[in-house]
């Protein structure tokens, strides 16, 4: 049967919601064809295959920018059992961009920290969440129930009139040319075909990605391959359990205990070489027996059991023309740092602003190449840390475990061990950031920019991102710095749809909320930005739309130079045809 286009009823054309700040008016007017009622889904801006957290986040980020998005998934509903259980502050900050962070945070609990327990039951390693103040504006690490999180993300998608989702549909093939991707989709209930043409397609379809397989995209194996049993249970009676998460580093049976939100608890248990993973899929008795090695099961109610083969894999190339890999389709990591879901959300954030910049003609197509450059290195570093923790936990040689305990205990006792888990999450190591003449990143470039609480005049306190939005932002602590920018520098800021803001500690109260050039003047509540800039001996920072630092300026001349370099990286290589084609 030949594939034929199927027209699906939908209505695009509602502008993205205006946000609270005067800086944050919708900055991507929908093109004429997008403003037509009952637009066919056969022609969209972005097609996303996979409706898990990565795909749903990307759909929200692109929908909020006003793009026509179609997201498909072969499942008919959300998988109703917990999978990922922890995430970090950057994830909530990304969720903040499309208005669900508060809802997600309200249903989560702070991560209590983790103790690594050695052969004799002694603590050999400890991790704590980063102490206050919360530099990104959110809890450093938090516990959640994934089905609830996915429901919140999908409800947010449903509120976007220019985004549609198709459940129980499978991507069965695609082709691409210079201008678009043509995808063949099948409705699983009756085999009805659908052809969709999209300017870009994103594979967020998981570890067994159909798209990655069709691309024949090679994957790098970082040599971690272990079978683990995962058991989620609800506390249903009196029971003594640790208040903090625990890594049981015992050769006889390595395991992990995780404190979930509410009464949810998780145990991850390494299977021994002689054990058959299939046995634990089929036998509740076997699961309960092995769980009994870690806790009293009489006061627990079973929620779900899964047997996973933990991998450490990273795709070599994440961009293939107009097709991109994201989430588990691009990388898989063992769970010992709780960063698997976080990595996929970061992929979505990195990709969203770059697709937006290219489709709006603010940058050339080469910007999209930096997606692989930036995210792959970041993920490799995180996977490396997760793998190293997994090797600590999973050591099964008694003599090696005894030596491990001796070294780690000594490091902990002497203060040589890093105990803040967030410090194992790096900044960006290369990509679109300010560089030194030798190609290294300038000091501070690639870090996540902080998010202070600010207000205008005597107004309410807001997180800074809510008042600036997903765009390039020049944040300065002195009006003199911004006033010194010449017309060329100011024109660059306007050309990239950037904004300037002035943030001062305790000085804006009672003063005008804008200067003569209409630059917003904010007062910060906790002195966070003042301290941050002082640490770099700086007067201003350029933050990217995804909140990573492009560059930090020590003076007004340096700020102007950074803007010129940013113009070179973004605007000058832009293809005029893109501007003409996309308005």
Locate predicted features.
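FAD/FMN-dependent oxidoreductases across multiple families
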Residues: 280-343, 378, 382-385
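Core beta-strand elements of the Rossmann-like FAD/NAD(P) dinucleotide-binding domain
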Residues: 44, 190-200
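Glycine-rich FAD pyrophosphate-binding loop
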Residues: 63-83
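Conserved FAD-binding catalytic core of PHBH/FMO-like flavoproteins
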Residues: 106, 154-156, 200, 204-310
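N-terminal Rossmann-fold NAD(P) dinucleotide-binding loop
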Residues: 55-56
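Active-site-adjacent segment of FAD-dependent monooxygenases/related oxidoreductases
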Residues: 83, 88-156, 260
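Helical substrate-recognition/capping region of FAD-dependent monooxygenase/halogenase enzymes
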Residues: 3-45, 49, 64-65, 118-121, ...
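A conserved short coil-to-beta-strand element within the FAD-binding core of flavoproteins
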Residues: 167-181
């Amino acid at each position: 049967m030949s594939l034929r286009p199927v027209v699906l009823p939908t209505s695009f054309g509602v502008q993205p919601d205006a946000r609270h700040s005067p800086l944050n008016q919708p900055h991507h007017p929908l093109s004429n064809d997008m403003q037509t009622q009952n637009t066919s889904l056969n022609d969209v801006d972005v097609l996303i295959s996979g409706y898990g957290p990565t795909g749903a986040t990307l759909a929200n980020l692109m929908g909020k920018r006003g793009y026509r998005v179609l997201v498909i998934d072969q499942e008919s509903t959300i998988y109703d059992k917990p999978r990922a259980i922890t995430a970090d502050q950057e994830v909530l900050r990304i969720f903040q961009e499309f208005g669900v962070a508060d809802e997600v945070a309200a249903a989560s609990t702070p991560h209590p920290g983790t103790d690594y327990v050695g052969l004799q039951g002694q603590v050999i390693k400890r991790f704590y969440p980063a102490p206050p103040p919360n530099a990104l504006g959110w809890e450093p690490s938090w516990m959640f129930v994934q089905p609830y999180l996915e429901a919140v993300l999908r409800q947010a998608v449903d509120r976007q009139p220019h985004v549609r989702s198709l459940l129980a549909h499978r991507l069965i093939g695609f082709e691409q040319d210079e201008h678009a991707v043509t995808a063949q989709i099948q409705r699983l209930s009756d085999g009805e075909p659908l052809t969709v043409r999209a300017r870009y397609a994103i594979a967020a379809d998981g570890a067994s990605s159909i798209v990655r397989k069709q691309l024949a995209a090679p994957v790098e194996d970082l040599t971690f391959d272990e079978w683990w049993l995962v058991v989620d249970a609800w506390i249903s009676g009196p029971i003594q359990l640790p208040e903090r998460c625990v890594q049981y580093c015992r050769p006889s049976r390595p395991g992990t205990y995780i404190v979930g939100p509410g009464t949810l608890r998780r145990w991850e248990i390494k299977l021994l070489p002689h054990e058959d993973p299939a046995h634990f899929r089929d036998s509740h008795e076997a699961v309960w027996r092995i769980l009994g090695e870690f806790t009293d099961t009489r006061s627990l109610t079973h929620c779900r059991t899964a047997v996973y083969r933990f991998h450490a894999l990273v795709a070599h190339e994440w961009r293939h023309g107009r097709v991109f890999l994201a989430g588990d389709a691009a990388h898989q990591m063992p769970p010992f740092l709780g960063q698997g879901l976080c990595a996929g959300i970061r992929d979505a954030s990195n990709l969203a602003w770059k697709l937006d910049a290219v489709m709006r003609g603010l940058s050339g197509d080469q910007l999209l190449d930096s997606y692989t450059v930036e995210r792959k290195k970041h993920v490799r570093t995180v996977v490396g840390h997760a793998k190293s923790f997994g090797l600590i936990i999973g050591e099964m040689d008694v003599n090696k475990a005894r030596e491990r305990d001796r070294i780690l205990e000594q490091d902990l006792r002497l203060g040589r061990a890093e105990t803040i888990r967030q410090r194992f999450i790096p900044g960006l190591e290369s990509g679109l950031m300010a560089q030194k003449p030798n190609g290294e990143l300038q000091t501070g470039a690639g870090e996540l920019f902080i998010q202070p609480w600010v207000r205008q005049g005597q107004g309410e306190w807001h997180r800074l991102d809510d008042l600036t939005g997903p765009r390039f932002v020049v944040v300065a602590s002195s009006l003199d710095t911004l006033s010194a920018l010449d017309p060329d520098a100011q024109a660059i800021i306007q050309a990239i749809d950037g904004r300037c803001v002035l943030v001062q500690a305790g000085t804006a109260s009672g003063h005008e909320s804008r200067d003569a050039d209409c630059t917003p003047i904010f007062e910060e509540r906790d002195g966070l930005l003042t301290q941050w800039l002082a640490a770099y001996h700086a007067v201003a920072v350029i933050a990217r739309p995804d909140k990573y630092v492009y560059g930090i300026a020590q003076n007004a001349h340096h700020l102007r130079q950074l803007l010129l370099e940013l113009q070179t990286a973004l605007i000058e290589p832009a293809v005029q045809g893109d501007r003409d084609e996309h308005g």
